[in-house]
């Protein structure tokens, strides 16, 4: 009989502890709370055993309640941290994109600067070669140093045409005797052009 009442008391104290854990906050819990049948038992060993059981179960209950409150707070804090971490991640992502963009722009600028410098180097060399050729051409053309570049180029074109005509006349069997006349007329025309420019 004592066994069955002991089991009933244990079951009842477990239920009480469970109900305390569900409904009461830690300040409202009373570890000595029990049923009337629990208070009627007066055996010291049994009483200390059940009191320890009730105390341990309520402590478990309080721990459970504290854990539930902490987890709710942690959830709130976790959500705040999650939002904060999300915004920080977005900021870091944006910053890394900006850094990548700046790096690619700077690389492109360096590449374009080097390309521009190489292009300017080639353009400078090209201009130097053109100027050298123009000086040589000025020396070959009669009165080429006395006129501007555009006039000198026109005279050079006329002079080249004259030279082609001379080649044709000298290479043909019938017209070779007229070559000196063509030379004189071509030469006179160049001379007249240079006089008109001065």
UniProtKB/Swiss-Prot annotation:
Chief place of localization: nucleus
Keyword S-adenosyl-L-methionine: no
Region (Basic motif) location: 114-127
GO molecular-function term, one example from the UniProt record: RNA polymerase II cis-regulatory region sequence-specific DNA binding
Induction: Strongly induced by iron deficiency in roots. Slightly induced in shoots.
Species classification: Eukaryota, Viridiplantae, Streptophyta, Embryophyta, Tracheophyta
Disruption phenotype: Slight reduction of shoot length and 2-fold reduction of seed set.
UniProt keywords, alphabetically: DNA-binding, Nucleus, Stress response, Transcription, Transcription regulation
UniProt-annotated stretches for the region Helix-loop-helix motif: 128-163
Main function: Transcription factor that acts as a regulator of iron homeostasis. May act as negative regulator of iron transportation from root to shoot. Does not seem to be involved in the suppression of the induction of iron deficiency responsive genes.
PROSITE patterns cross-referenced by the UniProt entry: BHLH (PS50888)
Name the record gives this protein: Transcription factor BHLH133
Alphabetized PANTHER family for the sequence: TRANSCRIPTION FACTOR HEC3-RELATED, TRANSCRIPTION FACTOR RSL2-LIKE
Classification via SMART domains: HLH (SM00353)
CDD domains: bHLH_AtIND_like (cd11454)
Additional notes on this entry: Plants overexpressing BHLH133 are hypersensitive to iron deficiency.
Nucleotide-binding in keyword set: no
UniProt xrefs under SUPFAM superfamilies: HLH, helix-loop-helix DNA-binding domain (SSF47459)
Domain bHLH: 114-163
Classification via Pfam families: HLH (PF00010)
